[in-house]
């Protein structure tokens, strides 16, 4: 897909990937940095752990990730979830970690900690989430992959769920990522090409409570790693190309015990009032650069105004027509940007609907 110096030499690599590890296990410790990206490093274990509780804490140089000052740079990694590693396979694992400071407090960029507490506090509500992660594929020059150099493809229209040359780009990456997620046990539920060429979407969920953020972050890590092997960049910018092009979001589907019960549409209506009252607070944690995307055009609501409706993709919240017909189900929060943190999204939704800690 690009110059060979930027991609993996798979044929050469496979000679080494098949070597016997002699009982050792490679554990890829993954964490979220200060900029909403993923970082990782590998630790050798003497045997395969049977649960995440058997994994040791580790640490990293937080001054190199903007998570700690240079004179007190150690940040600790506490494993919270583990998954089969689709790249190394065998007994090797991916380890999702929370970040903690040396004084025993969660790092200020550890949004998972408070989210997990909220989900535990409101466990009786049985929050189910489903996230729709949109992203854009970029070439090494930072321009959307497959677009004319310095130019633009034809207008939007034929690309959404498109099939065929000139309508979709980099399907190999999308398919590889799908398989990697399934192998790792990520609850990926589908994929599709999006409205803007070189933009794609995958869906994760339904997931229960804190599991939503965990699975979404691992899926992002896997996407970056897969694209790395093809020499292609992944952008979660909510408006990567200015002008008459769709932005990228992280639409968030939400249900609770109350909304799924008979007559649950009444609970959904009551939630709308609560969400409207805290619209500004939600926008504050729904991603950077979201003002470029939430303009009231290109299937978005206006960032300054809360609105909702049945089957309305131009509102802040969409209530699916089938939900309105059934009188129960879920709603879709269309405000979050593609680069938003899923822990912050799901956490503030739980807080707004059910109360804080």
Curated annotation (Swiss-Prot):
Enzyme class, spelled out: ligase
A GO-annotated cellular component: cytoplasm
InterPro entries in the cross-refs: Gln_synt_N, Gln_synt_N_sf, Gln_synth/guanido_kin_cat_dom, Gln_synth_cat_dom, Gln_synth_gly_rich_site, Gln_synth_N_conserv_site, Glutamine_Synthetase
Keyword tags: ATP-binding, Cytoplasm, Ligase, Nucleotide-binding
Lineage of source species: Eukaryota, Fungi, Dikarya, Ascomycota, Pezizomycotina
Subunit comment: Homooctamer.
Domain GS beta-grasp: 25-104
Record's protein name: Glutamine synthetase
